[in-house]
Regions:
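Positively charged n-region of N-terminal signal peptides that target proteins for export
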Residues: 1-6
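Bacterial N-terminal signal peptides
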Residues: 7-15
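N-terminal signal peptide c-region/cleavage motif recognized by signal peptidases
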Residues: 17-19
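Histidine-/acidic- and/or cysteine-rich, low-complexity loops and terminal segments associated
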Residues: 21-145
Length: 145
């Protein structure tokens, strides 16, 4: 009987390790790819479990219109959503000089990796957190050329 209890404790302990592996403090990812002038595919991946009822929500320029959006899909320990944006109101420079951000970072004690890939090959990466919840897309690449 004692060995059954020990075995049960080990199995439960391993189960808790698996639950802990789905870490709610893992950073989210916001990837923005320019696919045509003023057209962008946006991928948002965030942990399925949060620490708050306040959702994490990507933010983009108001002049960008959502052309299509996927339903959130469970993928591993995260939830993935895709959007296609049309940003004709931004002019020829597109997202350069524009602000991307995520709301809800403070309430969730979260961070987000933002990755922006433009048609001309410029690439940008920035970590957003409670102190820096926004990213202004610069004219010069920050990810090395």
């Amino acid at each position: 009987m004692k060995s059954v209890r020990i075995l049960l404790a080990l199995v439960l302990g391993l189960g808790m390790v698996q639950v802990a592996h789905a870490h709610r403090f893992a950073p989210s990812l916001l990837q923005v790819d320019e696919v045509a002038p003023q057209q962008y595919n946006m991928v948002w991946k965030t942990p399925a479990q949060g620490v708050s009822n306040v959702p994490l929500r990507p933010q983009w320029p108001q002049s960008c219109e959502v052309r299509s959006a996927s339903e959130p899909q469970l993928e591993g320990t995260g939830v993935v959503t895709n959007w296609q944006l049309q940003c004709a109101g931004l002019g020829e420079s597109g997202l350069v000089g524009q602000t991307l951000g995520v709301s809800g970072l403070g309430a969730n004690q979260a961070s987000v990796m933002v990755m922006v890939n433009l048609l001309d090959g410029r690439r940008y990466q920035q970590v957003l957190d409670t102190e820096h919840p926004d990213f202004v897309v610069p004219a010069q690449s920050t990810a090395g050329d």
